[in-house]
Amino acid sequence: MTGSIVKTEDISSISGRGDTSQSPEEVEESLRLIEDLKFFLATAPANWQENQVIRRYYLSNDEGFVSCVFWNNLYYITGTDIVRCCAYRMQKFGREIVERKKFEEGIFSDLRNLKCGIDATLEKPKSDLLAFLYKNMCLKTQKKQKVFFWFSVPHDRLFADALERDLKRSSTGSQPTTRAVSEPALSFRWEANSDVSLYDQITNHVDSQRTDSRPSTVGAQDVTQKQNNRVTDTPVSASKDVEPFESNVVEDEVQIVDNNKMCYGLPHSESNNYVPQQLIVPQSDLERNELTNEFDELNADLKPSDILTSNQEDDDFPLDYFPVEIEYSQTSMDSSLHMASQGAKHPSQMMFYEDMDGMMLGPKYPISAGIYEDPFFREEMAASNASKYMMPPPMSATRAHFMTNGEYYSKSREGKKHGKSGRQHGPDDGRRDYDNENVGSSPSENQNPNEELDATENNQDADDNRSPDIYPPTDAMANDEYIPAYNRRMQMSESLVHPYTGMMLNPYMFCNMLAVDPSLNMGVNPVVDPFYGQNHSMDVAHDVYSPQEVVYPSNYRSTPKAAYFNMRSPYGRNFPPPSAMNPYYTPYHRRQPSSATRRYFSKANLINRKSKSPPRKNVVSKPSHKAPKKVNRTRHATSMHVGLGGKDSGNTSSESRDDSTKEDSN
């Protein structure tokens, strides 16, 4: 090959006869470019960058680029690029495309054999993939079409079928889509009756053209004029001038020179003026080394002159430049904190890690050394805000969830007057009587008016004696569910639960500070699960409060779970009625919001039952469908009722006078 680099698409020129004449080097260059394209088609999906989406290969000015696209973890090639590859190979083979449209139709007809889902994917019009391919000039339109998988396209088979169609048209006298214009297509003879396939015949012919190429029959002047008129459009060909080809001149073979012996930047004549550097070793050092004989056996025959001619790999950065020393502590660990002798250890007693063999490190190691792992989480060591487990105030269906400001202040004033006398009533304190089964009747219907006023005053007293706060009384929490946090530890020692709280020790030493299982001495199971209300600052409380006689776990409950939560299990034999169980606070399924204006909704399981208490003032109540009965009362009866009642309030007497006045007027 010559020293000049020739552009691929400009290696041929058309003579007066219409045929193309090439030099053997140009034919070899064409075949090499075909091999380069085949290499790209085989290895394009390899060695991609992290965010790379497309990889291109330049064909020529006419064909442009062929692209490999990475989309949805798959590599694709378009039908347009497949046609470009076939056309490019046909031109480099030496056949010029005469009818481009008919040539493309033949290749697209062969591509119909590649089915969707197996060898290709069918994209919708103007999809994201088609839009990307169209922007990168891989497609001519964004219509609905197939995009082929990269390794599913048989490029060699498509090229051989296209060439076979043209050769058959030429043999039958039809107009072919391509015609032979240069080597190796001019010298190729197709044997249709041969057992060898067309592609194998092409391969054998190309191999023969590489080894025994025909000499050019064109004169030297024509070739010189051809190369001078050549248009160069690549950086390589533009940077170097193409030397004219001279016939009957055999060039000398190119000598391969080692890169290490080449002189860069200076001519050969000027490079001889410089003297290479030499390593100068003092004679005293050599004599001292010879006298002491401290050379190693492997380096005994090493001479200073060998350093200059040594391999470059030996001049790498030495690995022993930085001295590496491993220090092992010779001091024994402090064994003064042994809780048991080495011989007395039992496998059941070693509940902790045996990394330190049941010992702690001495004071010579600081805490910041981080020898021990932290067995605790930081959020578990944070002190809680409350030292006692307290349930939130239960939501009740027997009282309203909403309270106006007037009700709150009125209850506060009444509570100051009466004190806490309402606490001494029976268990039915604060509950109203719902024995009246007449849902639609008024409060005064079917009743004696004197009894109505008595019930009204009694209900008002019951409402006044009720405590306004919504928290349960103190005795309501005196059950096993509300055991304080300090009593839950029971007989557990402070040092066993939190060994680093009362001692000035490192918390990282907790795993290895005990050699004996603490549960053997305690007699109880420690509470290992965290619970609400546990406070590290209250660990000394067990010294003040004596432990209980019976030890309960943290999740112990004195009442059955079904009765506690009022949950009806489907596995029970009998279905208990709601009245059979009386939980000491309202269950979850009964915590329903009630109305602030219609107070009779506040009782659970009792709806639309009116209470006996009179309606509140300044509140508009819904009228009843039934007209109330008019009851004629005399002033004497009213005064007798007030005297028997025992409580003469200003509001009650004024209301009775107003009622009697209205009745007298009627």
Swiss-Prot record:
One of its GO terms (molecular function) is DNA binding. Residues 51-161 bind DNA. Pfam families: STE. It is found in: Nucleus. It comes from the Eukaryota. Its main location: nucleus. One of its GO terms (cellular component) is Tec1p-Ste12p-Dig1p complex. One of its GO terms (biological process) is sexual reproduction. The keyword Transcription applies. Phosphorylated by the STE7 and STE11 kinases. Signal peptide: none annotated. Residues 1-24, 214-237, 438-450 have a biased composition (Polar residues). Residues 1-25, 205-245, 409-477, 605-666 are annotated as: Disordered. Residues 414-423, 623-638 have a biased composition (Basic residues). Keywords: Activator, DNA-binding, Nucleus, Pheromone response, Phosphoprotein, Transcription, Transcription regulation. Residues 425-435, 655-666 have a biased composition (Basic and acidic residues). Binds to the DNA sequence mediating pheromone induction (called the pheromone response element = PRE) which is found in the upstream control region of several a-, alpha- and haploid-specific genes. Involved in the mating process. Belongs to the STE12 transcription factor family. This is Protein STE12. The lineage of its organism: Eukaryota, Fungi, Dikarya, Ascomycota, Saccharomycotina.
